[in-house]
Structure formats: C-alpha cells, structure tokens
C-alpha cells in the first residue's frame, strides 16, 4: 500500500509542474491536532515567496477537491533549502560525494542516526562513508535524509 506522502506526491506533481516548478518532495508530520503537510518545490532559478504562494493556492485547491487528509493540518510550501531533504534514489544520486544526515527506521551498524558522505546509489540501496567505514542502507529504511550544508 502506498504511503500518504507518495499518494500526495502523485496527486500534486502535475499541478506543481503546470506552474513551472519541480515537486521536490512531500513531508507529512502528525502532531496531534496540529499536523503539518510540507510541500517542497524547486525551480531552475530558485524559489521566492511569490512562487510558494502561487503553488500553495494551487495545491490547496487540489487538496480541497481530493480531500486526502481527514484531519486538520497546516499546509507549508517552501524550497528545499540548503539542508535540503532527499526523498528519491535520483536525488541521492545527484548528491554523491556530499555529506548527509540520515534518520533510519531500523538500525544499521547499531545506529539509527548516521552522518557521512554518499559514495554510491545502486537501485534502492545507498552507500555512505561514515567515519571511514562504508555502510549500505536501503532507501526504504531511511525515515529522513538531509544534505549537511557546508558554509
């Protein structure tokens, strides 16, 4: 069965792309009565607040019609930012060599939290160099993955 995030991504991809943006990813955080639906968008020339507002109106209209979430939630539309979350194998592959922070569902090498450089993406498997040790993580074991911004 598809997750809520994947169903929402399928539902919102076309409307976001119709406005000239890429749907980078979806994050749904349940926090009791105050759940949050985060929609991350990206564009060739970056994203500004007006872009977010336009996408928010379009996404809100689609969600009002489709009504995929039965509880109250707050809709947030933003760019992925410098510490961008990663959602797909293609996104991880685009950042080979970059440092990432991973939160895992099941421990790998005794830890559910890893920081290291992406060395390879092979299908649905991600290789990460953590303190000189090569670890392999299944993408479906990653609860949350973010680029570690370098300043």
UniProtKB/Swiss-Prot annotation:
Protein name as it appears in the record: Ribosome maturation factor RimP
InterPro entries recorded: Ribosome_maturation_RimP, RimP_C, RimP_C_sf, RimP_N, RimP_N_sf
Keywords tagged on the record: Cytoplasm, Ribosome biogenesis
Function of the protein: Required for maturation of 30S ribosomal subunits.
Domain of life: Bacteria
Record carries keyword Cytoplasm: yes
One GO CC term on file: cytosol
Organism of derivation: Shewanella oneidensis (strain ATCC 700550 / JCM 31522 / CIP 106686 / LMG 19005 / NCIMB 14063 / MR-1)
Annotated family: Belongs to the RimP family.
Subcellular localization, as worded in the UniProt entry: Cytoplasm
HAMAP family the record matches: RimP
Membrane-spanning segments: none
Keyword Cytoplasm: yes
Pfam family, one: RimP_N
UniProt-listed GO biological process terms: ribosomal small subunit assembly; translation
